[in-house]
Amino acid sequence: MKSKKNVLTHFNDKNTRVLIRALLVGFFALDRQAQAQSILAPGPQPPTETPPAMQQANEMDVFATVPQTEAEPLKWGPLTLRPHPYYQFLDADGLQSGTNNSVHSVIQTISAGVLLQVGSHWALDYSPLWLFYSNREFSNTFGQTASLMGGTSYKDWALGLSQSYSDTSSPTAATASQTRTTSYATALNGSYAMNSKMSLDLTLNQQFESADQFSSYNEWSTLDWLNYQFWPRFSASLGMGGGYVNESSSPDITFQQFQGRILWRASDKISLQLAGGVEVLQFLSGGAAPLVNPIFGATIQYQPFEQTRFSVTGSRTVSSSYLQNQVTENTGVTADLNQRLLGKLFLDLSGGYQLVKYVSSVNTSSSSRQDDLYTFNAQLSRAFLKRGTIAVLYQLSEDNSSQAGYSFTSHQVGFQISYTY
């Protein structure tokens, strides 16, 4: 008979695969978080924080790579430290410091992040962020992000926990100004293998969002799936869930979701992940009628050659807004091409479109705002000293808003240097 300690800390292959599915396809919960829509080019991306015990390959990920097995220079017993310093320089125009006011600025971002792995089941990441603006219409800021991820298994159950925190400030499209936002997110995942074909995915989520001088909210939700594995690399699921949103200065909301999901690895080179259904929202005050919306999330990955990767992602969600008495209907599509050149250079090209419709959560006759956002990103990078990366980048962002003062066009060029142990 196994001891309780061994049962709780040992990952067999079946439970590891179940937990990985629950963690890595969790984005099919169709994120309802308010979208800050930062105008700036993407900043530091922390290294993968998935604990080693859960780093089995995701069979739906065509782009999965074999984990590195290099010696760990900063390892003491069960503790492994992975610093990931980062620097970015941007020369940007079209940055909104207020409605009808787009300006130019040089932005420098410095981060001294560190990832701590505790044993094989827990990973904790912390990244302080310093942003310096040459234009005095913006404030230099200190921000920070942190995340914790862990998991274990017990008999036919695989259990996971994730916690994240962010406190950042940047020019955003939604507010047409530099806006400080704070976010706390907690997720509890449980997956149960009923038999060789059927399984359950259970999730509880808590999200606290706030924005200085704008609306804030707290949300609690669940989305649960019944999965059936028809054959290897193909499964289908039915899901349902719901939640409650407590708004600081807008009507509170209840909502329900009903979805279907398909995961299909058609070949070693292509995969399809698709989820969709309907969401119903009720406003608990203000007199607005309930909203019934189609929602979906989809990703196609295609790798025709070892050095070429192509993906397309689309989604439609409904989320709370930082603007008072508003929710947003968000529909978007993004395509990304990653190409290795001459064996050492990596070219990444991506473009996207997002339609954001602001819907009143109170009974009013005023017209609603609509934003059409277009983005294009180009980045050429090269590795150095095995663990370092240097890249030059360009970003074009354009927002055509139906509300006066919120439209802009921004061009950004720069470079970034990162190093990950």
State where each predicted segment sits.
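Gram-negative and organellar
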Residues: 37-421
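Cleavable N-terminal export/targeting peptides
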Residues: 1-60
